[in-house]
Amino acid sequence: MTAKSASYTLGTLEADAGGCLRVWTGGASGPEYFLLENRQASGRDASLPGSGLAVWHIDEQRSDNTNPLAYLVGLMQADGKRDLELARNGGDPGDLFPGSGKKTSFHDKSSPSSRAHDGGSTGVALSGISQAKNAVKVTVKR
């Protein structure tokens, strides 16, 4: 399969109802995938500790969020600290991309990584993650 790459500019869900992207692992639909969402500390999200790209790892093969190593729905925290899973805090400025750590990519070898819960490669890579006003830009390879 040839890798496909495309660039996106995401508005907030409040401003752009179609502003959430689903990125399938392996480029084909299945029970494990990523959702990309622009979250800004304004409006209904004014209490967020930071703004940027939320990368959600979804695994519909899981029934709940009781296994902190393989949640049904888990936020891939840009800082890689896993503070949410370890109940260290309720979120911090390093959780969304690029975040306080200025992390502009997410892939199989990054921390956190885009690997599947079984450790296999998903083929998903995000690069060029940046913020411009209330929008988030990202290039997606799948």
At which residue positions do the language-model features occur?
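Non-catalytic C-terminal accessory/binding modules of secreted extracellular proteins
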Residues: 2-142
